[in-house]
Amino acid sequence: MNHTLPALSKRYSDNPTFILESPELSLSGEGYTCIIGINGSGKSTFGETLAEISANNPGEKWYYLPQHLDRFLFAENLSEQLSALLSQEINQPRLISLIEELGFSDPQGMLHFPFLLMSGGERRRMALVCVFYLEPVRLILDEPEIGVTAKENMVLLSKLHNLTGKNTRVIIISHNAAFVRQSSDIICLINGKIARTGQTKDLLSDPTFELEKYGVRFSQ
C-alpha cells in the first residue's frame, strides 16, 4: 500500500541555523517506516511538523506520541486519559489485556494508578497502551524504546506489526537497530535534510549504506 508524505518545512526563531526541509516522499512498503539520524538531525521536528500540518485534515491526520510524555499524558491516570479522548465507553477487558501485554503485573490496578507515581519506563509503556487502544489510522512514535526493556521492545514490535497489518500507517523515530531492521522503509536525516530514503531491504543490501552514520545503535 503506497503512501505519500507531504513536503515539510520548519524553522525556529531561537535557532535560525537549523531548517527542516523535506520534499514530498513516497513510501512503498507494507510495514512501518523508520526515521533515523544522529541527535539534532531533525527527527523529532519531522514528526512534530507532520502531525501539526495534518491536524486540521481528519482524512490525513497523524497521531503523534512524543519523546517527552508530559505533553501527552495530560490526565491523572489511564482510565481518565482514555475517557477524555473517547466518546464511547471503554472496553475494559480489551484495555486490561493491552496493559498486561505491555508487561504490567497488576493490569487492573494500573487503570487508576497515577502517572506521576510511575517510573519513566512505566509511563512510556502506559502511553503505548493508550495509543494501541486508540488504534489511530496514522501514528508517529518518537523513540518508543526509551526506558523500555529488550523483552518489552519485542512485544512492542509485535504490536506494531499487528497495527500495520490492519492498514495503520506507522512512522517510528528510533536509534534501535531492531526497529530499523524490521521496518519497510527508512528515511535518513542529516541537519534537517533528507540524506537518503528507500525500502529497508534495498538500503541494507547496499554496501555503501551505514546505519551507524545515522546514530543507529546495535547494543540494544
State each model region's role:
Residues 44-87:
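ABC ATPase nucleotide-binding domain signature region
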Residues 114, 143-145:
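Walker B catalytic motif
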Residues 114-118, 122:
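Conserved ABC ATPase signature
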Residues 193-217:
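Conserved beta-strand-loop-alpha-helix hinge in the C-terminal portion
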